[in-house]
């Protein structure tokens, strides 16, 4: 879910004085259960040859792929209109702006 949040929701916005507009989680957009797709987790064991017991970190793996996959899917859908979104998060406002810029 962290990667989906990065791709579609999470953004630090600041006012003209440089103060954050969202200073609590009540104001900061994060995906919740209503926005969560069904996720099926598969495990594949690939021990690291560089550590004593083959262990590796796991925290980053779920956050790295989703923004790229979602971005590619959105841009694939926009391709026929000559539009592209190249900034995260991918919001409806940014998609509409990309379509307008492309003259679609």
Feature map (PLM): residue ranges:
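C-terminal catalytic domains of large/alpha subunits in multi-subunit enzymes
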Residues: 1-104
């Amino acid at each position: 879910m962290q990667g989906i949040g990065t791709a579609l929701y999470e953004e630090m916005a600041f006012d003209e004085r440089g103060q954050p507009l969202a200073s609590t989680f009540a104001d900061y957009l994060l995906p919740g259960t209503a926005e969560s797709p069904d996720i099926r987790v598969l495990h594949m064991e690939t021990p690291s040859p560089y550590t004593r017991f083959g262990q590796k970190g796991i925290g980053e793996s779920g956050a790295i792929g989703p923004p790229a996959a979602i971005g590619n899917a959105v841009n694939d859908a926009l391709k026929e209109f000559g539009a592209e979104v190249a900034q995260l998060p991918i919001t409806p406002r940014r998609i509409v702006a990309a379509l307008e810029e492309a003259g679609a």
